Structures are given as structure tokens and as C-alpha cells.
Amino acid sequence: PKEILEIPKLGCINVHGSLLPKYRGAAPMQWSIIDGEKVTGITTMYMAKGLDSGDMLLKAEVEITDEDTFATIHDKMAVTGANLLLDTLDQLEAGTLERIPQDHDAATYAPMITKETGHIDWSKNRQDIINLIRGLNPVPAAYTIYEEEVLKIFGAVISDVQADDAANGEIVAVVKKGFVVKCGDGCLLITEVQARGGKRMMTDAYLRGHAMKEGILLQ
């Protein structure tokens, strides 16, 4: 409530995991990776009645590399966010901060992650699927259905296997390092998985104990 936010003399400050007004909401770090962003960041801001809509104070950018996952970005952002909050408090106390209103017309949203968010749609292109896997690694994890069982997927790389006649989601090859799945624009090699009730492991280790079949359609 507005009356609560107005109690502190210097206002209520929030640390948000995006460069506002982009990615307002519950899961900005995950969605920035899922959407293929190359840069994200931290914004300190005044809390307001609307969702992440308050005036901004300071920002700091954080690079998203091709290898970053939700776990690694979370850790980078935690350090950046802590330092930015200290800078914000110091400048707030000194009276040197400017309030910067958000451009509400430019706002985008990062809704809460649900289990269904992680259900892989194999008709999408390979990079979009890789980004989904990265953005939900380690939790809740992207997943597919193999022979009526959930199979979580934590790693995938673009494969040069050609399978133009295969259906999207079809296992087109089982090789030493993993299994190859047909996607909307080519194939992916799945490199790290976790079966229901099992441990997370590299796919080559998983295949030593599980015989995956070519031609099976992942759902």
C-alpha cells in the first residue's frame, strides 16, 4: 500500500534483476536468457504500487555469454546487485541521486516460470531451444517426454547431422556423446540429462545405462 511505502524517510528501495523498464516481473534473469539477450543488468529503483514501475535510480549492465545459464547469471547479478545497492544508499544519503521515471510504453514483462514453461517444443529453432535450456538450468529445468517419462535436459549443442525427412522431436541418431534430436531448423545433440528419480549426468554416461532408440518421437 502507498501509505506503507511512504513511511521510510528516504523511501523504499528495490533491487531488480533487469535493465528496467524491460523485464518487469518475477523472472527477469530467466527470460533474458530464454529470449536470447546478450546484455542484462541490475536496476535500483523506488518501490511503487505498480509492478516494478517505480522511478529508477542506478543501473549496471551484466553481459550474458553463450555459456551462461540461469545459475551463472544469478551469481553474477547477486554480486553486481549488492554493489549497486551500496552505491545507491551512499548516493541517496548524500542527496546526489536523480529519480528517473520509467518509460511505461517500453515496458516488457517476465512472468513467473511454471513447469510448462520448460516443456520443449521441438518445432522451434535450435538456438531458441538452447536458450530455453540455459534459462531454466538448474531449476526448474527444460524437459521433454521420452516413452511417457519426463527427461530433464540441461545441455545441448547444435549438431551437423542432416535429417530433413525426420519429424520434429524425433531421435535421429544415438552417438557416443549423446543423442541427436530433429528440431525446426536442424538437429541438436543433447549433452546433459536427468531421468526421473535419477541424478543429473552427461548424456554419454546416461547412455551407458539406458538404451535410447532411434526413431522415437519426443513429446
Stretches found by the model and what they are:
Residues P1-A110, T114-E116:
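Donor/substrate-binding cores of folate-linked one-carbon enzymes
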Residues P111-M112, T117-D128:
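Active-site loop ensemble at the mouth of alpha/beta enzyme cores that anchors a bound cofactor
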Residues K22-A26, W122, K199:
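Alpha-helix N-cap/helix-start motif
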Residues S123-Q219:
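An anion-binding loop in the catalytic cleft
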Residues G11, G54-D55, Y109, E116-G118, ...:
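A generic secondary-structure signal marking the coil-to-beta-strand transition
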